[in-house]
Amino acid sequence: MARCGVAVLVLILLACVAAAAAAGGGDHHHRRGSRASARLQLVPAAPGASLAERARDDRHRHAYISTRLASSSRRRAAETSTAPGPEASAFAMPLTSGAYTGTGQYFVRFRVGTPAQPFVLVADTGSDLTWVKCRGASSPSAASPSGSPRVFRPADSKSWAPFPCSSDTCKSYVPFSLANCSAGTAPCSYDYRYKDNSSARGVVGTDAATIALSGSNGGGADRKAKLQEVVLGCTTSYDGQSFQASDGVLSLGNSNISFAARAAARFGGRFSYCLVDHLAPRNTSSYLTFGPDASNGASSSRTPLLLDALVAPFYAVTVDAVSVAGEALDIPAEVWDVKRNGGAILDSGTSLTILATPAYKAVVAALSKQLAGVPRVTMDPFEYCYNWTATGTPPAVPRLEVRFAGSARLQPPTKSYVIDAAPGVKCIGLQEGGWPGVSVIGNILQQEHLWEFDLANRWLRFKESRCAQ
């Protein structure tokens, strides 16, 4: 397909992320060790729904994020991680993309159970519970990204161990677990309700994930290993469109029951990912890595990563300033203060970046001022769209820069915020999130950068990268 067509589709897809994101974990009620690293191959999200639907779904996800951050009763994180395993080299899991399924998510291939059963899950930094569709799941039967329906069969797994509903883990740590417990030995149940009216219901326990370890020196063949006691939800009933494009969710959220915490505990206390251009073809891939990433060296910028309960299960950062064309914008400081009902989070499950109203108005006004000479067109859901071919010469796009605490500067490529919406049409690809409210840096703005979440030392590192293998 011509790049123009891909642009249309994938940016058309821009509106659907949060639903997919929700399926991926955004609207989910989900919520250290050897010098090894784990790689999960990521592939770009694909086009499918309309741009308006993508934007709508992102708004649903933003509402979910806001609701969780506003909650006054936050569950404690479960200390489910075990001691680091024996010295192992890199941990690599093959991943695939959600691009060809019509979602805006990045998918990972995940193997769980004994014997291992393969699944395609959404890699989601906003989720704290990994879950898969289970046998007996009641919902419209849809093909998984692999081409055929996949369901987890806990009865076939020798390593599956459900949590009793009477256990402290169920009552205190599992997000959105059900309070009813008629028999103490009954399995721990959950009922997730999403902002787009989707839901997922099932039981939770632990199982073993199969990972591929490779030598730390880069040599030698990969060898299989088991990551034990991974917290896993077995979803037996689900409703809505959010779950049609994947087999479930791989939780990368800020929670000790998430897969990210479990894997990072064994592989260096950190994980990283690099999102390729969201318009990249299906055969272009990147990686989700557990453990130190050699490619993220001295050239990286870094800023403190906020991991306290106030923002869990999300990853927050402090924004010091935003500038357009080298000019700092007048945005009130409280907009970036998570303790004052503001703040900013980095979210792989949201596609379009959503800014709190004061920041949105300032950024869009500055960008549109610089583009005043380009003919405007109307295209929902965006406020500013342009006929990009009207002048004959492609207009110059002003540089957007986000400066984080510690003087770390993010300068995303212009295609990450002035996006392709239709043939010959570009839009300022940002959404207004209201105020008070949190701002969300979506996966489009994150593309073509390597992001490392150093959980052990509470740093977020990033640098520009093409990401492709």
Where are these regions (language model features)?
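Charged, amphipathic alpha-helical segments
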Residues: 186-195, 256-258, 270, 378-390
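Signature of the N-terminal lobe/flap region of pepsin-like aspartyl proteases
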Residues: 89-92, 97-230, 236-238, 243-245
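Aspartic protease core domain of the pepsin/retropepsin superfamily
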Residues: 187, 197-314, 425-469
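N-terminal zymogen propeptides
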Residues: 2-101, 156, 160, 208
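Cytochrome P450 catalytic domain signature, combining two hallmark sequence patches
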Residues: 138-168, 269, 301-305, 362-380
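Charged, flexible boundary elements
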Residues: 79-110, 314-333
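Aspartic protease catalytic domain
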Residues: 2-50, 113-115, 123-128, 139, ...
